[in-house]
Design a protein with these regions (language model features):
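Short boundary motifs at domain starts and secondary-structure transition points
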Residues: 1-2, 169
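Nucleotide-state-sensitive switch-loop elements of NTP-binding domains
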Residues: 3-9, 17, 21-165
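Residues at the beta-strand->loop junction immediately N-terminal to the Walker
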Residues: 12
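C-terminal accessory "lid"/substrate-recognition subdomains
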Residues: 157-234
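A short, hydrophobic C-terminal helix/tail in secreted or cell-surface proteins
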Residues: 235-240
Length: 240
């Protein structure tokens, strides 16, 4: 019997945007999915994992939470990420994997790592174990309005690649869906300005307004939004 490739949702967004809130919403409403979750935290203590573990207890048989700490899955923990993905996919216990990236993670290297793994398996005549289904960036509407002039500041040239501006821009540029969280905190004009900026950064991204991460799961899971062919221009990473 041919093993089915497990779809992956990659969840990105800066600290405080609402990634963990959204993830806990998914856990409470997973509607029959058997979900495995990988939570990345750059510190020694994975705070987000502890918050998620509480809700995971509700679905003990259908949920597993794995923490990756002391580094970023976009750089120092690439190999650890692949090992965990392979183990979860090979266990035959889950039909969906969600990765919550650290707030300072860049999404492109993570997507490259997963794509690289599939390319390697294909070159060896082996079936893929997992694949990217959707990349979601959770954005804080209030913060974009108050600190980034409704996002317009992100369109200005940025010389510091490690700055918050550059990171937010990368997260918004490289995603399939933007969850505009805390949407109730800004007025309609501000929302429209923010959406216009998002579409300038990523013209094909879908935008979903949300409060407290409340989104229909059908808009998040098994969307087939990520098309690896569209990203073949990306340089594949060296995994060490």
């Amino acid at each position: 019997m041919k093993r089915k490739s497990i779809p992956i949702l990659l969840l990105t967004g800066y600290l405080g945007a609402g990634k963990t809130t959204l993830l806990n919403h998914i856990l409470k409403n997973q509607e029959g999915y058997k979900v495995a979750i990988i939570v990345n935290d750059i510190g020694e203590i994975n705070v987000d994992q502890k918050l998620i573990d509480k809700n995971a207890q509700i679905q003990k048989e259908d949920t597993d939470v794995v923490g990756l700490t002391n580094g970023c899955i976009c750089c120092t923990l690439k190999l650890d990420l692949l090992q965990q993905l392979s183990a979860l996919a090979s266990s035959n216990k889950f039909d969906y994997i969600i990765i919550e990236a650290s707030g300072i993670c860049e999404p492109i290297p993570i997507a490259q790592t997963i794509t690289y793994a599939n390319e390697t398996l294909y070159s060896r005549g082996l079936p893929e174990l997992f694949h990217l289904d959707n990349i979601i960036c959770v954005a804080d509407a209030a913060r974009l309005s108050n600190e980034f002039t409704c996002g317009k500041h992100l369109l200005e040239p940025c010389e510091d690649e490690d700055s918050l501006d550059s990171l937010l821009m990368q997260q918004l540029e490289f995603c399939n869906t933007v969850i505009l969280n805390k949407a109730e905190t800004v007025n309609e004009n501000e929302k429209n300005e923010i959406k216009a900026v998002i579409h300038k950064l990523c013209k094909d991204a879908g935008i979903i307004e949300a409060s407290f991460g409340q989104v229909n799961l059908e808009e998040l899971l098994n969307t087939h939004n990520f098309d690896s062919v569209s990203y073949t221009h990306l340089t594949l990473p060296t995994i060490r």
